[in-house]
């Protein structure tokens, strides 16, 4: 059993991590790479995407970058889905070989990888998951915290 003080310390550490995922103005120096690991994305090689990101983060010694396996984001047809926090950039149909480009261009150079942005129903590229027409009219209940917890 942990002491009350140890539990408080764990709570504060986790609260800081969650703030990066909930409040996009927090943690500009720290990045979280959220990778969907729902069944649809897993069948499209999201496990390899996660492994590649983790390997690259370690190889490049990116101490302020965390790779986080998440549950389903609810748009399986566009998987594997990767979201970079805190800016909430939404990449779709990410292949294992795309990880190097995302790490170099987005994480290190601070540039969006345009070719991996999701296209909306009218063909325009969308930077953020919530800007997709697919999500705009939805009231997400079961998936409201997807990628946050």
At which residue positions do the language-model features occur?
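Feature of Fe-S/electron-transfer and energy-metabolism proteins
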Residues: 1-149
């Amino acid at each position: 059993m942990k002491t009350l003080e140890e539990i408080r310390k764990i709570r504060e550490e986790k609260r800081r991590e969650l703030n990066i995922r909930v409040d996009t103005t927090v943690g500009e120096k720290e990045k979280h790479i959220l990778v969907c690991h729902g069944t649809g994305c897993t069948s499209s090689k999201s496990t390899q995407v996660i492994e590649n990101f983790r390997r690259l983060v370690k190889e490049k010694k990116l101490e302020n970058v965390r790779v986080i396996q998440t549950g389903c984001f609810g748009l399986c047809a566009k998987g594997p889905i990767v979201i970079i926090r805190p800016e909430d950039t939404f990449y779709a149909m990410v292949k294992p070989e795309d990880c190097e480009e995302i790490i170099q261009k987005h994480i290190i150079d601070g540039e969006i990888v345009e070719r991996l942005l999701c296209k909306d129903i009218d063909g325009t590229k969308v930077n953020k998951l919530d800007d997709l027409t697919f999500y705009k009219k939805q009231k997400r209940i079961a998936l409201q915290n997807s990628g946050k917890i």
